[in-house]
A protein has these predicted regions:
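Intrinsically disordered, low-complexity regulatory segments
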Residues: 1-169
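Basic, low-complexity terminal or inter-domain segments flanking catalytic cores
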Residues: 2-3, 25, 80, 117, ...
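Metal- or metallocofactor-binding catalytic centers and their adjacent structured scaffolds
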Residues: 241-282, 564
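Phosphate-interacting basic helix/loop segments used at nucleotide- and nucleic-acid interfaces
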Residues: 72-97, 200-201, 292-293, 398-405, ...
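C-terminal or mid-to-C-terminal helical accessory/interaction module adjacent to the motor/catalytic core
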Residues: 136-221, 274
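OB-fold/S1-family RNA-binding modules
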Residues: 49, 93-98, 138, 231-248, ...
Length: 672
C-alpha cells in the first residue's frame, strides 16, 4: 500500500486525480492501492524553550543563557493536530511513502520531519516537479526518485531551522532583557537573516541623512558635421575632478565655455561604430520577479511571492516560483509547442504575436549547466482563464509570459557610436545609439526596463580628421544626489548581492558564488517581519528604518549585523544540502558561534536610548508602551512584581498596583 504525502490540499487533489484516488476521506483521498494525503505547511515546530527545562520558561532570565539543546524536540502545532492525526494513522497502514511536497528545501523538511516524528520505517520515494499542470504531474509520476537523492536537502532544511531557532531564542531574549534594564519595553528581536537585512537599510538611511550635496559642473558643446547638429560633453582632466570624475572647479569650466565660444571649428579625433547584439532577458527567478514588480508597480516582495504562488498552485499558469534560476533545461524545448498553445488558449489575443515567433531559435536561456534545483519561472502547458485573475495576478502572469515569448524573437541589434573631438585643445566626447533591429524588444513596449537609459542621439557619419563646426557651448551646474532609499525590489537585490557589503576578497568571492542573504523563499517574509516588528516602516514605495531599528543596529555586535557572515552560513547550508558537510558539524559550529555572542552580549552594557515615557504611578519606575485590545497603554517595567499602568495620552485610567490593588486616579502626563 502506497501513501502520497503532499504539502497542501490543492496539490493533493491534483495528484490524486492522476492516480485514480477519488474516494474522499477525512483529510485524504484514496483509490486502488494508493492513498493521497497532505500537510498544510509545517505541522510540526521546534518545542518552546521551557520544554528543555523550566529554567528557560517565563520570566526570561539572562543567567540561563545560552540555551543549546542536546536533543532537539518537535511538537505538533496547536492548529494542526487534526491533520497530523490523519497522517499518523495513515502511515501505520502503508509500507511505502511518496514525498510529493514542494520541490525545495522547505518542502523536504515538511514531509521528512513527519516521517521521522511518526517513526515510519517503510520505503520512501520522491516526486520531484516544478509545475502542477497535468503534463508535469504525469511526467514526474512516471519518474519517481529514490529517497536518498534528496535526503541531504532535508538535513540542510533542519540545520537552517535549528540555526534560526538558536539565534532567535538566545539573542532575542538576551537583548530584550538588556533593553529592559535601560527602559526599552519592546521585544528586541534578533535573527540570523533579519538583523543583517535591517542593517543594510539602516546604513542606507544613514548615508541619506548625512549626505551633503556638492556642486559639480559640465560643459555641453553643440557641434555640427555636414549640417547635422549634436551635443558633445567636455572630458575634464583628472586634476579638475573628484573621485567620480566630475569637474568641481567652476573657474576652469567658465574658461572652457569661453574657449568654445571663441573657437568656430574643431576636429574629429576618432569615430567608431560597433554593431551590438543584445539577448532577450532570461526567465525570472523569484528575486528578479520581485524586483521587476517593485519597479513597475511598487508591489511589496511578499505580495509578489503570494501572487506567484497562486499562479502556480491555484491557476496552474506558471511554474514553481521559489527558484533562484533564470535558465531552462534543453530538454524542455520539446514542450515549446504545448506551452505556446496554452498561452494562446489562455489569451487568444496573442495569436498574431505567437504566429511570428521562431521556435527553432535557440536563445541563451537553454543551458543545462546553469540549472539549479528548479528552472526559471515560465508559463505552463495548462490553458487557463484570464478573467479569473485579479489585476495584480494578470500583471505578474503577463510579465512572466513576456520573458518566455521573448526567447523566440531575434536578438536586438544596436549601432553604438562613440566619437571624440578636439576643440581648442580640449577633449569632447559624444555617444549615440541607433536601433537597427528591435528584435525581442518590440514585444515589451512600455514594459521595457525603466533602468535602461542611453543616449539615443542620431549621429552623422564622420571620420577622423574631419572638421566640425562649433555652434555654441553652455555650462551646466549640477548637484550630487543622495542614494535612493530602499524599496522592496532594491532591498531584495541587496540581499541577493551580499558581496557588495564586504571588502575581504576571499569572502566576496564566496558570496558571489552563493545566493546572498536569505533564500528566494524567505526574503519577502524577512522584510515583512521587520515592518511588523517596528524596525522598518513603509513610506509610499520606500522602506525606511525606524528610530528603534537604527538604535538596535547601533548596539548589536558587528557579527550579527554583517551580511557577509550571515551569507556564509547559507553557503554552509548549501554544503549540507550537497552532502559535503554533516548536520552535526554545521550545528556544532553554530552553537559555538551563538555561545560566543551570548557571552559577549552579557559582558557589555546596552547603550540604547529609551523613548520618553511616564513614570509608574505605583512604584515610580520606568514604563514601556504596550498594545492592548482597547489601544495602547504604558506598563511598569517591573511587571509582574509591580502592575502599575498608565493610559496612553495620560487619560484617566485605573492603575493596577502591587498585589493587584485598584488605585483610581487621573494622570496628565505630557511626553516630549
Amino acid at each position: 500500500m502506497r501513501l502520497v504525502l503532499c504539502e497542501k490540499p490543492s496539490q493533493g487533489r491534483d495528484i490524486a486525480k492522476f492516480l485514480g484516488a477519488t474516494q474522499r476521506g477525512d483529510g485524504f483521498l484514496s483509490g486502488p492501492g494508493v492513498t493521497v494525503t497532505w500537510a498544510r505547511g509545517h505541522l510540526l515546530e521546534t518545542a518552546e524553550p521551557e520544554v528543555y527545562g523550566e529554567q528557560y520558561g517565563k520570566p526570561w532570565r539572562t543567567e540561563v543563557l545560552p540555551l543549546l539543546p542536546q536533543q532537539w524536540k518537535l511538537v505538533v502545532k496547536a492548529d494542526a493536530k487534526a491533520q497530523f492525526a490523519v497522517i499518523n494513522r495513515l502511515l501505520k497502514q502503508v509500507d511505502e511513502v511518496v514525498i510529493a511536497t514542494d520541490a525545495d528545501r522547505e518542502g523536504e523538511v515538511i514531509a521528512r520531519e513527519l516521517l521521522d516524528y511518526c517513526k515510519f520505517q517503510g520505503r520512501i520515494f520522491r516526486l520531484w516537479m516544478s509545475a502542477l499542470d497535468d503534463a508535469s504531474i504525469r511526467a514526474a509520476l512516471s519518474d519517481l526518485w529514490p529517497s536518498s537523492r534528496t535526503e541531504a536537502l532535508y538535513y540542510a532544511g533542519v540545520g537552517r531551522s535549528r540555526a534560526d531557532w538558536l539565534i532567535g531564542m538566545n539573542l532575542t531574549r538576551l537583548f530584550t532583557l538588556k533593553g529592559r534594564e535601560v527602559g526599552i519595553g519592546n521585544v528586541l528581536s534578533v535573527g540570523r537573516v533579519q538583523t543583517p537585512t535591517l542593517a543594510i537599510v539602516v546604513q542606507r538611511d544613514s548615508e541619506i541623512e548625512n549626505f551633503v550635496a556638492k556642486p559639480y559642473f559640465e560643459v555641453i558643446a553643440t557641434l555640427a558635421v555636414n549640417g547635422a547638429a549634436f551635443p558633445a560633453k567636455w572630458v575634464p582632466a583628472a586634476q579638475y575632478c573628484d573621485e567620480e570624475k566630475r569637474c568641481i572647479q567652476p573657474g576652469v569650466v567658465a574658461q572652457v565655455v569661453q574657449l568654445c565660444r571663441q573657437t568656430p571649428t574643431g576636429a574629429v579625433i576618432d569615430c567608431q561604430t560597433e554593431r551590438k547584439k543584445q539577448s532577450a532577458p532570461l526567465a525570472f527567478s523569484l528575486s528578479s520577479l520581485q524586483q521587476a514588480c517593485s519597479r513597475h508597480w511598487g508591489m511589496p516582495a511578499q505580495t509578489v511571492l503570494d501572487i506567484a504562488q497562486k499562479l502556480y498552485e491555484t491557476h496552474k499558469l506558471t511554474s514553481y516560483p521559489r527558484t533562484d534560476c533564470g535558465y531552462l533545461p534543453v530538454s524542455m524545448r520539446e514542450e515549446i509547442p504545448q506551452v505556446l498553445s496554452a498561452v494562446v488558449g489562455t489569451d487568444p489575443a496573442l495569436q498574431p504575436v505567437v504566429a511570428q515567433l521562431d521556435t527553432q531559435f535557440v536563445s541563451r536561456i537553454w543551458n543545462d549547466k546553469k540549472i539549479t534545483a528548479h528552472h526559471g519561472i515560465i508559463p505552463t502547458k495548462h490553458t487557463g482563464d484570464l478573467s479569473k485573475l485579479s489585476d495584480e495576478e494578470r500583471n505578474v502572469y503577463q510579465l512572466v509570459r513576456l520573458h518566455y515569448l521573448a526567447q523566440f524573437m531575434p536578438l536586438m541589434e544596436v549601432d553604438a557610436t562613440e566619437a571624440t573631438f578636439n576643440i581648442g585643445g580640449q577633449l569632447f566626447r559624444t555617444r549615440g545609439n541607433v536601433v537597427v533591429k528591435a528584435g525581442w524588444k518590440s514585444l515589451f513596449g512600455k514594459m521595457a526596463d525603466d533602468d535602461e537609459k542611453g543616449d539615443e542621439a542620431v549621429l552623422p557619419a564622420m571620420q577622423a580628421g574631419q572638421v566640425c563646426q562649433v555652434q555654441g557651448a553652455e555650462q551646466k551646474v549640477l548637484q550630487t544626489k543622495p542614494p535612493a532609499p530602499y524599496n522592496d525590489g532594491t532591498l531584495i537585490a541587496a540581499m541577493t548581492n551580499a558581496a557588495a557589503f564586504v571588502t575581504d576578497a576571499a569572502l566576496k568571492k564566496v558570496l558571489k558564488e552563493n545566493a546572498g542573504i536569505g533564500t528566494e523563499a524567505t526574503r519577502a517574509g524577512i522584510i515583512d517581519t521587520l515592518v511588523k516588528r517596528g524596525f522598518l516602516v513603509r513610506e509610499k514605495k520606500a522602506l525606511r528604518s525606524t528610530p528603534l531599528g537604527r538604535s538596535l543596529v547601533d548596539v548589536l555586535p558587528g557579527t550579527l549585523t554583517n551580511p557577509g557572515l550571515t551569507a556564509l552560513w547559507e553557503q554552509m547550508l548549501d554544503e549540507v544540502a550537497a552532502g559535503r558537510v554533516s548536520l552535526d558539524d554545521f550545528m556544532a559550529k553554530q552553537s559555538q558561534w551563538v555561545s560566543q555572542l551570548v557571552a559577549q552580549g552579557k559582558s557589555q552594557p546596552l547603550a540604547i536610548q529609551a523613548p520618553p515615557s511616564p513614570p509608574c504611578p505605583v512604584c515610580g519606575g520606568k514604563t514601556s508602551q504596550r498594545k492592548g485590545k482597547k489601544g495602547s497603554f504604558w506598563r511598569c517595567l517591573n511587571y509582574p512584581d509591580c502592575k502599575g499602568i498608565v493610559g496612553d495620552g495620560g487619560n484617566a485610567k485605573t492603575l493596577q498596583g502591587r498585589g493587584g490593588s485598584s488605585l483610581p486616579t487621573r494622570l496628565k502626563i505630557k511626553l516630549r
